[in-house]
């Protein structure tokens, strides 16, 4: 999915102890405010359903066109030494993602009935799902799984078929911006009008490396939340350090980096060095 990047002596020890106390305080604030990241696939699915339902019920922004970025859990057989946990790419992910999108759609739709599906593109591992509502056909929800730039025609066709009263979701899209459809020409312009100008976020759980830190972003309607996950201290365990305040727009990399510099002034490698000096090497404890 994504790779994580891991970025003299009395002075370092004092700084480390101070930061550890600060990190603990920030973690408590994060937990109290309910910003903790999903701790399991089941929790991620539950929170995705809640966020999407909230977005659908929002009276503005019709027709409902939503993005979902779901962090697909690694297969049970994954080992720590595996360089690529998904050597089969999207084809390997698809069965897991199919179960996930079915669970989400079933949870989003009131009185969920049958969920039908079809393959839009076998080479691109792209599928189409329709979750019917037994309460009202206008409450059916459709979803396209793993749409790529090659599915622009399909997105436009399905958007028209779904109509203005029903919701259409793009889950784990394989593009980020209009330029991905080409720097010039009609495809770029069409993608902007058909996708980027119409779709808004319904739910997201994303991870990225920022200044060598493991950063998690979540979107739960209507806000984006951000935190850094620090797990270099074995005794303290994994800590979620709140970064930016909840905001309507996805946090920019520069804003995240500036906040990390404020709350974690020492880079990861220096904190690990301080821990080793204070407590000894992990295998010696």
Language-model segments: residues:
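N-terminal chloroplast transit peptides
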Residues: 1-36
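Composition-driven, intrinsically disordered low-complexity tracts enriched in small residues
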Residues: 24, 265, 269, 273-276
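Positively charged, amphipathic N-terminal segments that serve as targeting/anchoring signals
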Residues: 35-157, 161-166, 178, 276-281
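Ordered hydrophobic segments in well-structured contexts
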Residues: 65-69, 141-145, 167-170, 216, ...
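Residue-level detector of flexible, active-site-proximal loop/helix-junction positions
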Residues: 75, 175, 248
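Redox- and metal-dependent alpha/beta enzyme cores, enriched for Fe-S-associated oxidoreductases
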Residues: 167-184
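A conserved mid-domain beta-alpha-beta active-site/ligand-binding segment of alpha/beta enzyme cores
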Residues: 179-265
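C-terminal structured domains
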Residues: 259, 272-284
């Amino acid at each position: 999915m994504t790779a994580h990047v891991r970025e003299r002596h009395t002075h370092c020890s004092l700084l480390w102890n101070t930061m550890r106390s600060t990190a603990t305080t920030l973690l408590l604030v994060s937990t109290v405010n309910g910003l903790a990241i999903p701790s399991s696939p089941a929790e991620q699915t539950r929170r995705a359903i809640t966020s999407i339902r909230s977005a659908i019920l929002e009276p503005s922004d019709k027709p409902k066109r939503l993005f979902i970025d779901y962090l697909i859990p690694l297969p049970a057989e994954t080992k720590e030494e595996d360089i690529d946990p998904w050597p089969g790419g999207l084809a390997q992910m698809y069965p897991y993602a199919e179960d996930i999108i079915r669970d989400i759609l079933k949870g989003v739709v009131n009185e969920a009935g049958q969920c039908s599906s079809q393959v839009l593109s076998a080479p691109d591992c792209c599928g189409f799902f329709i979750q019917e509502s037994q309460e009202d056909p206008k409450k059916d929800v459709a979803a396209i799984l793993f749409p790529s730039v090659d599915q622009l025609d399909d997105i436009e066709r399905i958007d028209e078929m779904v109509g203005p009263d029903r919701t259409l979701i793009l889950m784990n899209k394989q593009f980020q911006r209009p330029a991905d459809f080409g720097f010039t020409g009609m495809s770029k312009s069409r993608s902007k009008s058909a996708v980027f100008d119409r779709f808004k976020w319904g739910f997201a759980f994303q991870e990225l490396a920022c200044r060598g830190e493991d950063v998690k972003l979540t979107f739960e309607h209507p806000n984006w939340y951000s935190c850094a996950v620090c797990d270099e201290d074995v005794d303290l365990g994994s800590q979620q350090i709140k970064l930016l305040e909840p905001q309507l727009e996805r946090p920019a990399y520069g804003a995240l980096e500036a906040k990390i510099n404020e709350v974690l002034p020492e880079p990861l490698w220096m904190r690990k060095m301080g821990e080793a000096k204070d407590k000894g090497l992990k295998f010696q404890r």
